[in-house]
């Protein structure tokens, strides 16, 4: 028999947010219910919350449409940000020199799963 699928995932690639800053937000929503995660993201001041909100929304939509899971029973099982390609820029400095500026990007992944029955 086929095993029932109880989780769904969504990924956003090359998001223009430093992974370190995205992880600060992802750490706060990990292992929370989806509704609680939405509430947390709505009121956090970090700029990365908009991108993370979109990925969470996509993961929930994947769970509902692809696997017929109920939104009320979902929790954020995994949430992580890996480093994407770095955009390298240069700032002119004194005496004709230049300093590098690294504009970092992230790959944000969120996995939602059904709550385990106790």
Curated annotation (Swiss-Prot):
Origin: domain of life: Bacteria
Organism whose genome encodes this protein: Leuconostoc citreum (strain KM20)
Protein name (Swiss-Prot/TrEMBL): Large ribosomal subunit protein uL22
Subunit description: Part of the 50S ribosomal subunit.
Keywords from the named record: Ribonucleoprotein, Ribosomal protein, RNA-binding, rRNA-binding
Gene Ontology MF: a single term: structural constituent of ribosome
Entry-linked SUPFAM superfamilies: Ribosomal protein L22 (SSF54843)
UniProt xrefs under InterPro entries: Ribosomal_uL22 (IPR001063), Ribosomal_uL22_bac/chlpt-type (IPR005727), Ribosomal_uL22_bac/org-type (IPR047867), Ribosomal_uL22_CS (IPR018260), Ribosomal_uL22_sf (IPR036394)
GO CC term, one of those recorded: cytosolic large ribosomal subunit
CDD domains: Ribosomal_L22 (cd00336)
Biological processes annotated in GO: translation
HAMAP family for the chain: Ribosomal_uL22_B
Designated gene of the protein: rplV
PROSITE patterns: RIBOSOMAL_L22
Protein role: This protein binds specifically to 23S rRNA; its binding is stimulated by other ribosomal proteins, e.g. L4, L17, and L20. It is important during the early stages of 50S assembly. It makes multiple contacts with different domains of the 23S rRNA in the assembled 50S subunit and ribosome. The globular domain of the protein is located near the polypeptide exit tunnel on the outside of the subunit, while an extended beta-hairpin is found that lines the wall of the exit tunnel in the center of the 70S ribosome.
Family (UniProt): Belongs to the universal ribosomal protein uL22 family.
Lineage: Bacteria, Bacillati, Bacillota, Bacilli, Lactobacillales
